[in-house]
Amino acid sequence: MNIASALIKQVLTVQDFETWSVTHKHYMPAEYHSLYGVIEKHCETFHKMPSIEDLKLEIRDSDTRDKLYAVEAVQVDSEPYMLLEYLKNEYTQKQILDSLEDFIDNSVAFEDAQESVDHLHQIVL
């Protein structure tokens, strides 16, 4: 189960506008960006959360519709706010690992040991 699909399913199922309002597109994996956009547009237009049935009628793009059907099939028992926290943690960890990877790729080969340690301390702080 993907955390993003579980979050979207729960937010739509329980109509949790509060959790959705603090969910950012960049927290989601790229394959969910189009579905996020459709939900966000519906919220801005109608000032309420769409149902899954509403989205089935609104979505014209077949890839986005397929993603919605996949989300609908997910079995979820967790609360939306908890799923959002998990998604934020996953996003943050990925950003940290990407930063460390960039640091290693760009600097380790060109620095001595002390400079590398100093740069790692700067990243941590």
Describe these PLM feature segments.
Residues M1-E90:
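Noncatalytic partner-interaction/assembly domains of nucleic-acid and motor enzyme complexes
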Residues A73-L125:
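Interdomain "pre-motor" coupling segment immediately N-terminal to P-loop NTPase/helicase cores
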